[in-house]
Amino acid sequence: MTLDNYNIFGDEYLFSMPLSPLPKVLGTFDGIQSAPTLTTPTLTPTTLRSIEETFFEMTNDAPYQAGFKPPPLAPLVNNNNNNNNNGNGNGNGNGNQQQQQVFDCGASVMPGSDTEESNGSWADGQMNEDQSISDTSSGATDSTSYQNGHMMGNSGGGNGGGTGGANNFSNVLAAAGRNTNTSNSATPARRGGGRRPNRSANMTPEEEEKRRIRRERNKQAAARCRKRRVDQTNELTEEVELLEKRGENLKKEMELLNETKNQLEYFLQAHRPTCQKVRADMLSVTTCNGLIGPPALLSAGSCGSGSSHHNNNSNSNDSSSGTITGLDATLNSTGRSNSPLDLKPVPIDEDLLLHIKDEPLDGALDSSSSLDQDGPPPHKRFALPNIATLMTPTGPAGSLQTPVSGTAPHGFGSFPTTISNISSIHNGPTLNSLNKMPKERPNTLAFQRPFGGQMQLSVSGRAPTQIQGVPIQTPSTGTFNFDSLMDGGTGLTPVSGPLIPNCTSQNKHPLELPTPTTEPSKLVSL
């Protein structure tokens, strides 16, 4: 026999009873693993098994307890008649209708094909599998009382004044309370929920001890978990507080630094007007084609200087024209100019020249000294005459140290060796030439003005060919002379005179002596 054979949840029973009170009735059964509640009115396999066990227990009761069989018809009719006598006329019809439905339900619950022998055989098999009579006796009593109360109380449904299914459920609960038998089990009825009953009757003491130990261990593990969670929460809270304090300290430090910066800026602005400005002309150097010199001298040589820049921090360098500013302007001009550094003579007062004392050449001055390395290379240097005798008249009578003039090139033999109006020369000696003056000097100075507008020509109108007895060996000397073109070669060969020693060259510093390697070859320009 299965639950389907009973068919207690048939269409007639479900339509005759309201659906909402059903979970309340099933919730009172003992032994249900997952008892349905008001929010979950569904039937689970565990609930169905519990219901089957309950029905099995009810089949073992005595026949006088009615079980699944309806009571005799006559007493029920008499009871109904008695109730009709006490009730009103409107309740009679409703009472008869409910009685008919109850009898139909009883017929559907107890079909004629099932017999007590089949119920007994099914009960024997269930007895061997599970011994749960004592555990579920209270539930069985409740179920039996529910069946009896339902069948016995529906006959008096007319007392409710025609309220129908709701009054029937109230009568069922009232009948269940009146007909409840005493429970045969010592285990109290469960209040619902939970995985297992509080104590099983068939559990041995060893199993109970193991269960107790397991529960204690689980409690300790849960307590440790809670403690660990609390400790971790406290640590995170402390860390957050520490970070907040650190952020506040950083904000205060930033505010202090900003205040200090504002004060320093205010002091700087207040002190700036009192600072003395550096003179602009102290750091400015005028250049012309890579040469450094005073502005007056460079302007005489028709080389305009650019506008001066007053930038004390940056060093501007212009090799062609302009102004170099900065402390290292001379070094920048020397290293970055297009042409090598060349120091030119500057105008010197004539009265100052008269007070300069002639000193003999220092023979210990070697080529490695700093004075020897300054200035132009040897082939660009020239010796200056005796400063004390610059203004003396030229001629054999006024000369005390007449040099032995070297033989000029045969192409320049007709040129005079002096330049008139020597007093008009404004170019004086340089520092290097003053330091390297020979001991014996001539009393004449014949050379062209480097920055003069016109060449100083002699009376005959020809260019000079010698300076202090040293022949001029540059191509520009014979550029505009026909004899030099005819006698000096084809214009593609170097034009130079023979190297004839004289007094001037013998008394020169060894580094200033002309040698074939000191002067580069010069070509005549046509």
Curated annotation (Swiss-Prot):
GO terms for molecular function: DNA binding; DNA-binding transcription factor activity, RNA polymerase II-specific; RNA polymerase II cis-regulatory region sequence-specific DNA binding. Residues 78-87, 133-153, 301-322 have a biased composition (Low complexity). Residues 210-229 are annotated as: Basic motif. InterPro entries: AP-1 (IPR000837), bZIP (IPR004827), bZIP_sf (IPR046347). Keywords: Activator, DNA-binding, Nucleus, Phosphoprotein, Transcription, Transcription regulation. Residues 154-165 have a biased composition (Gly residues). Residues 208-271 form the bZIP domain. PROSITE patterns: BZIP, BZIP_BASIC. Signal peptide: none annotated. Residues 71-165, 178-221, 301-345, 504-526 are annotated as: Disordered. It is found in: Nucleus. Residues 236-264 are annotated as: Leucine-zipper. It holds the Pfam family bZIP_1. GO terms for cellular component: nucleus. The modification Phosphoserine is found at S339. Residues 178-187, 330-340 have a biased composition (Polar residues). GO terms for biological process: embryo development ending in birth or egg hatching. Developmentally regulated transcription factor AP-1 binds and recognizes the enhancer DNA sequence: 5'-TGA[CG]TCA-3'. May play a role in the function or determination of a particular subset of cells in the developing embryo. It is able to carry out its function either independently of or in conjunction with Jra. Homodimer. Heterodimer with Jra. The kay-Jra heterodimer binds more stably to the AP-1 site than either of the two proteins alone. Belongs to the bZIP family. Fos subfamily. This is Transcription factor kayak. It comes from Drosophila persimilis (Fruit fly). The gene is kay.
